[in-house]
Each structure stands twice: as C-alpha cells, then as structure tokens.
Amino acid sequence: MGLIAYFDCPTGISGDMCLGALVSAGVPLEYLMEKLAPLGLTDEYRLTAGLVQKQGQAATKVEVKLLNDHHSHGPGHHGMRHLPEIEQLIKQANLPARVSRWSLAIFHQLAIAEGEVHGIEPEAVHFHEVGATDAIVDIVGTCLGLDYLGIDQCYWSALPTGSGTVRAAHGDLPVPVPAVLKLWQTRQVPVYDNGLTGELVTPTGAAIAVTLASQFGPKPPLNLHKVGLGAGSKDFPLANILRLWIGTEITPHNHPLSSEAPFGQLETITVLETQLDDIQPQAVGYLLESLLHQGAIDVFTQAIAMKKSRPGILLTVLCAPENQNHCLNLLFRETTSLGVRVRQQQRYALEREWQTVVIPHGPIRIKVAYGYQAGKKIILNAHPEFADCAALAKATGQPWQLIHQQAIGAWSNLNKELSPES
C-alpha cells in the first residue's frame, strides 16, 4: 500500500523547509546530492543539513549555499535562467520518471504565475524566482525526497498569509507576493492570518504545494509511520517548523478496529448549495442534467419557503473537489443565483462494480456494492440498472417490473452470497 504525506504548515512553507522535513523523515542528504549532480549545477551551490532549535524544538535545517554569490550577477548569468533552459536541465538529468514529471510541472506552474504577474509568456520568464540555482535544487530535491520515501499522495494544511513587505528583484512587494497569490488562486487554496509578520509562503513553496497537493485542508485519516521536521530560516514566537506526517491511509482493509470499521471508503466531496426563487421550472431539469454532465456526483432540489413567503428551491450539488469550479461556474451561468455556499464534507462510499446477467429477453447490467468486514470483502447489495430494464421492457413489450425481477433472480443464482431480499 502506498504512503501518503501531509504537510502541516503552521508558519508557512518554502523549498528549504520541504527539504529539511524530508531529510528529517529519512531521506539521506548524500542521496539528494548524488541525484542532483546530473543537473550540472554542482559548481554553483553546496547542500548542507543540520539540527537547529526553534522555540526549544529540534528540527532539520537544509541550506542551499550559493557559491560566488550567484544571485548578484546580471540577467545573462545562470541565476537568471529561462524556463526552457530549466526544463532542458531536468530532462537531461536522468531523474526517476515521476521526479522529472513532478519537477517539470512545478516549474511550469511557477512560470505561469510569474508570467501572469509580469504580463509575459511563461517561456519568457527569466527573473531569479524561477531561474535561481537554489529554486532548482529546492524543487527537484523535494521531488527526489518524496520519490525516495515512496509517497503516492500529498496533502497540505491551509496556508498562512503572512503580512508586511519583502524585498524582491523588482523592489519591495506586499506579502503574500503577487506570484504566490496567483498560485493560490489556481487551486482556491484555503488561507488564513496566523498573526505572524513577514513572508511565510515563498513562490517556490507555493508552487510545490499547489502542484503536488491532492487536497488542502485537514489531515486525512492515516496510520502514522513517521514525522519529519523541517526548520525555516526566520524566528517567530511560534516554532518555525514544517511538520511532514507520513503514513498509510486508513481504509476498511487496514482500519485499526477492522471488526468495527465502516464498510465504505472515506472520501472528501464538495457540497454546493444555493436557493432559487425565480428560476423557470422547465430550466431546473436542464440544469440538473447539465451539472451531472459536468461531473457532479449527484444533484437534488428541495422545496423551501424563502423571504416574503415566496416558494423556492434549495439546489444542492455534490461533486469531487477537482470538479468544484466547473459546477460552480455552471450554476452562475445557468441560474440567477448571486451566491453559492461551498463546503467540504467527508462521506463513506462503498466499492462498486458492474456485472452483466442475461435473462430470456436480453442482457441487464447489475450494479454491485461491496464492503469489508474483518478484512473480508462482502457483497452488500445489488440493483439492476433502471435504464437497461426500461429499454428492454419497451423493446419486448414486457412489464418493467417483470424484467427487473428476472434480472435480480438471474444475478442471485450466480451469486449465492447474497439473496435478493437481503
């Protein structure tokens, strides 16, 4: 079973904090140096790691020490590489396949954000935030560390905004800097003010999180194997440490109370809600079909009484987090709603599959749902597909109810573990 990683970022995130947490979690510094060497940058930096104290807590501080002050050189120097040059370095470095894929994706996201801020194409971005040697080492090194530990999925906490200003290549910028805001916007990252002043999330850290995160928010259920602690450079009243939680996801297969575990798999869904009192009734059916076509898991309406005693409907949309924006935009485009409530909820969903049975009148698909009890897979229910039964009833002139009963009987004969009545 693959591992999942949760990046707990109470004081923010930067590339060197990611590296520190990964080294703390067991990634050898020598491994990173060996795998980074084919990038051809070893004459530009030195990679070091050591324990430091942050508010009385020990954490690993990884530093990318630049040699000969590479940041001080002009645009023609390697510290100001363009995106295509960085992509070429990564592609030629013989990195593990997913390390290369992750690294390229992170740099592409970062270049898009920086390009939008400056009004240029991503390929034309050449300022130090993307091209600096330390950014390359931070990003590729983080991907190498995740691959070394066998991480399959990454999750991130909500991120703190910070405040104040920071000195950048183009002068003083407000915190969060524009590129970080652009990156957050692409994933609608949950952010909050933790009261700390300064830059807490760097463009490199934001790009890593936005690109690799399966989800932002609370910790997923996991069996915790180890914790890595990565120290930041600044000192705050709160320990400036990124905490990397590594473990296996809790499923019905490995639940610590397997005999009492829920049958279903825990997953996160997005719930969209809006009240409507002026939509044409004919448009409601079209809207529901459009939302399902757009990727909604389910859509339903409830009759409600609104202000001024007007009758209306409460429209609820369930969708996967990655389909949230598609469904949200469709709601605004196809209704008169001026606001939609959004929340994340967890649900237990049964594993399911399609089986086909053949009755005297033709084939019928059966949706079969499974659960796990004490580590054993069991069938919980099975239902003939309504559309198949309806189509066969129309084609043969037989009652729909007869077709449905015959399908259940045929499936039950093939699967003695569950009787039709149970």
UniProtKB/Swiss-Prot annotation:
Q: Does the keyword rRNA processing apply?
A: no
> What keyword terms does UniProt attach to this protein?
Nickel
Q: Note the InterPro entries from the entry.
A: Ni_insertion
The keyword DNA damage is assigned to this record: no
Q: Which molecular function term from Gene Ontology is one that the record holds?
A: lyase activity
Family the UniProt entry places it in: Belongs to the LarC family.
Q: What is this protein called?
A: Putative nickel insertion protein
